[in-house]
């Protein structure tokens, strides 16, 4: 790696992100380490996302029909246009937490064996974002964690260990372009990032996690999205890692903690606090329903699990673009 001046391409798949895309692009352009190019794959936006992107000379826009979008293949398409030594993947409704996001991603490439570095998502303090998820750092001490296994070692890991090692997130991740060419994302309706992490590890590469490489990213979820996201995530984690998870349970103490967090959020009115308490209650119930259907289907065998996944998640979960308390 050319530490003095690495070349970096950014790839962003988007659709109808007019409300947030400028914050995303401006955040990238304000980084302490500049990028070579920003490649945006737009899959049929019907708002003015594309028009806003045309204001930036550094942005290359590739337009595809919405029916051609796929979580894995669309990202591969973006990578095929990239010229940088490194490729960052993010999304149009995310923005860097600070101007050292790229620097912190690069910091993980201190070993030639590292194929990619992943950061974390955090939720910005805003009354339209779930206050239970607001980023409240307790400890500023962070460290880079690396995973590397032989194929035999990886296969001997428990499902929990596999899930932990592959908790990849391409909302905030940097890759060696050469590795993405060697190991592209699979065609899949969901979890393309976690599957890629497994493929990279099985191929003998090292992957790294740096919690200092943060982006702001948040989805206002309705019950249908939470249910589908829960079910499809469990499905793919089981298929690739053998992970079954545990049925979520909310204790009285858990409810009291949520109530306390919301109650102590001074930025919210009493009406807003009530809204967010009900919101979290509804999302927990939707998540629990996803777990229940997964568990019940799995007890009847893989065929039933595949059938239930097609039934409920044949159309992948799509997050809401609006996050209005009035909803």
Where are these regions (language model features)?
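Short, acidic, metal-binding catalytic loop of nucleotide-sugar glycosyltransferases
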Residues: 26-35
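A conserved acidic beta->alpha catalytic loop
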Residues: 42-50, 94-95
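Glycine-rich, basic loop-to-helix element that forms the pyrophosphate-binding segment
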Residues: 65-82
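Short aromatic/hydrophobic "clamp" motif used to bind/position activated sugar donors
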Residues: 87
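Conserved donor NDP-sugar-binding/catalytic core segment of glycosyltransferases
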Residues: 95, 99-135
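A recurrent flexible, glycine/aromatic-enriched loop bordering the glycosyltransferase active site
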Residues: 151-175
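Acidic donor-binding loop at a coil-to-helix junction in glycosyltransferase catalytic cores
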Residues: 190-196
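Non-catalytic, C-terminal membrane-associated alpha-helical segments of glycosyltransferases
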Residues: 229-235, 239, 246-327
């Amino acid at each position: 790696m050319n530490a003095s001046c690495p070349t970096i391409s950014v790839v962003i798949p988007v659709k109808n992100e007019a409300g947030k895309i400028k914050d995303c692009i401006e955040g990238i352009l304000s980084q302490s380490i500049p990028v070579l190019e920003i490649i945006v794959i737009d899959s049929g936006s019907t708002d003015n996302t594309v028009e806003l992107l045309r204001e930036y000379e550094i942005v290359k826009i590739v337009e595809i029909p919405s029916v051609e979008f796929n979580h894995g293949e669309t990202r591969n398409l973006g990578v095929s246009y990239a010229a940088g030594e490194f490729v960052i993947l993010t999304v149009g409704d995310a923005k860097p937490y600070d101007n050292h996001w790229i620097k912190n991603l690069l910091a993980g490439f201190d070993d030639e064996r590292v194929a990619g570095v992943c950061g974390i998502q955090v939720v910005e303090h805003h009354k339209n974002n779930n206050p239970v998820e607001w980023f409240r750092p307790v400890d500023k001490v962070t460290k880079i964690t690396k995973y590397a296994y032989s194929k035999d070692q990886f296969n001997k890991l428990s499902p929990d260990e596999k899930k932990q090692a592959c908790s990849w997130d391409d909302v905030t991740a940097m890759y060696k372009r050469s590795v993405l060419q060697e190991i592209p994302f699979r065609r899949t309706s969901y979890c393309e990032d976690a599957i890629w992490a497994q493929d990279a590890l099985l191929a003998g590469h090292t992957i790294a996690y740096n919690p200092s490489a943060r982006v702001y990213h948040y989805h206002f979820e309705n019950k249908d999205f939470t249910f589908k996201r829960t079910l499809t995530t469990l499905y793919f984690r089981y298929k690739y890692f053998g992970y079954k998870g545990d049925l979520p349970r909310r204790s009285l103490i858990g409810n009291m903690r949520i109530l306390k967090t919301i109650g102590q959020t001074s930025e919210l009115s009493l009406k807003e606090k009530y809204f967010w308490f009900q919101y979290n209650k509804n999302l927990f119930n939707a998540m629990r329903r996803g777990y229940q259907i997964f568990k019940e289907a799995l007890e009847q065998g893989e065929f039933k699990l595949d059938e239930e996944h097609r039934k409920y998640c044949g159309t992948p979960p799509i997050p809401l673009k609006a996050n209005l308390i009035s909803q």
